[in-house]
Amino acid sequence: MILEELGKHKVVTLEKLVGLLDTSESTVRRDLDELESENKLRRVHGGAELPHSLQEEETIQEKSVKNLQEKKLIAQKAASLIKEKDVIFVDAGSTTAFLIKELERKDITVVTNSIHHAVQLVDKQIPTVIIGGGVKMTTDASIGGVALNQINQLHFDRAFIGMNGVDEGYFTTPDMEEGAVKRAILENAKQTYVLADSSK
């Protein structure tokens, strides 16, 4: 039952398992410890998650067809926040791709770590800077040391970033290198906006 829940949701809380299994917290903890020793799950604070090897991240193409209307509304709101002469960072991602579609201003500079975003921006004749580095296949995001070095040399008026998950007090992404890039963006922006739909 525990592995079945993890298969559906990728993460499960201790509280939820106690209710589902109708058993004590200590019994659930023991079961989780046993499953972790068999590498079938990974214990996290307050519950468990699938081991990273089983958490396949959806590709940018798979994400781009989900929650279209919500992503469009988020992008419209984000575009309304951009001011004349802003230097903005637009992160790789499916929701941020909708922001690129909303951008019409030529009086801004857009920095991005997405090959696809850069092509669309150049087609719109919007001044564009693309971050180099290795490319993460599932998200088309530039990652690694080269990307970090470039980002750390720049400053942004506003940054619009995507995340894989949003939880109380923190954001998540399953890739450490991509996480490091997002952290650098946050540190180099005057204002940062996380563009995340309700599936996060």
Model-identified regions with their sequence ranges:
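Conserved phosphate- and dinucleotide-binding cores of soluble alpha/beta proteins
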Residues: E4, V11-L17, D22, S37, ...
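Alpha-helix/helix-capping structural signal
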Residues: S94, I115-H116
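HTH-adjacent hinge/linker in prokaryotic transcriptional regulators
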Residues: M1-D22, S26-A92, I100-T109, L121-I126
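Short hydrophobic/aromatic-enriched beta-strand-loop microsegments
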Residues: D107-S114, P127-G133
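Short beta->alpha connector loops
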Residues: G93-T95, S199-K200
